[in-house]
Amino acid sequence: MTDAAHLRRRTEELLAAHPPATTDRLDFLRARFDAGLAWVHFPQGLGGLGVPRSLQAVVDAELAAAGAPDNDPRRIGIGLGMAAPTILQYGTEEQKSRLLRPLWTGEEVWCQLFSEPGAGSDLAALGTRAVRDGEDWVVNGQKVWTSSAHLARWAILIARTDPDLPKHKGITYFLCDMTDPGVEVRPLRQITGEAEFNEVFLTDVRIPDAMRLGEVGDGWRVAQTTLNNERVAIGGTAVPREGGMIGKIAATWRERPDLRTHDLHQRLLGLWVEAEVARLTGVRLRQQLVAGQPGPEGAGMKLNFARLNQEISGLEVELLGEEGLLYDDWTMRRPELVNFTGRDAGYRYLRSKGNSIEGGTSEVLLNIVAERVLGLPAEPRTDKDVAWKDLAR
């Protein structure tokens, strides 16, 4: 029996044992994970069957046709796209067994404690400290622009464990329980009125050494797995043709012939072609994951995602004229989903402004593409081989 046929049979068995029409959503997701049909390329016992990642489409198609419930990447995207692949590569067997199932089902939401007020684009300059105390690490510092921290049970965290080493070398990667004493989450309100992001203060937070990911001092290398997956997750998300931002403006174009002009038509066609190229590039980028780690090419995909979202949402506002500017819902909200295309045109236009900042600023990503994809010389650095504690701040 081929792998595809085997997966179809297992999917049929899952549906027979847990009919979607009569099974609780969460119970179904747990059963799907236990059947190895959550992410089929993961090992057996961890939600997968150890088969090629490309075969996930077989399972997804069968379950969609049966009307089966699924998890929501808009709510748990950080866990699915960033934490899970990092835990799979660097985690202990105990960490994988404890964390991956509730991560995938959405029972436990994850957030990312990386950026700091003084270390965003230059992330390796981070100053949050982790000091060893017996079997624990005591963490103190501040993180910022943390999506979903107000919902999260767990966080992926990088902190400085050796200030005497150069900035990239004295960092260690941890898994932080967001319910621990000393963790304080405060909302950061955006120009849309909502507070999707947060700042997180860590005061004498004790993290067991058993929740360290990778070796002490090797956190920067571990974090590259997270960051590369983040850029693929943001820029290379699977989108159907005429989905996403381009789908919104295309729908408006069809519904409102009174707004059409030849100039707007030509510009919309150009953006539609670019969106289709980006969609197909995303397909190719995701195929790279089948063979293993995503590379720095994800930076280019994320760059294009930000530019396209901003241009398309800008054209939509221009198309609608005064109607496109009628965004007046500044109610303080704490959303449970990250939704770039939700609500109306005014919201999409305002929200898209953050796309060129989150997940790495466009300027930083241009450097990554230049140095790691094109092989151009790196920019001159004055902090190379200088201890972090001696850097000007």
Which residue stretches match the model-derived regions?
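Amphipathic, small/basic residue-rich leader segments at the start of a protein or domain
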Residues: 1-77, 88, 98, 102, ...
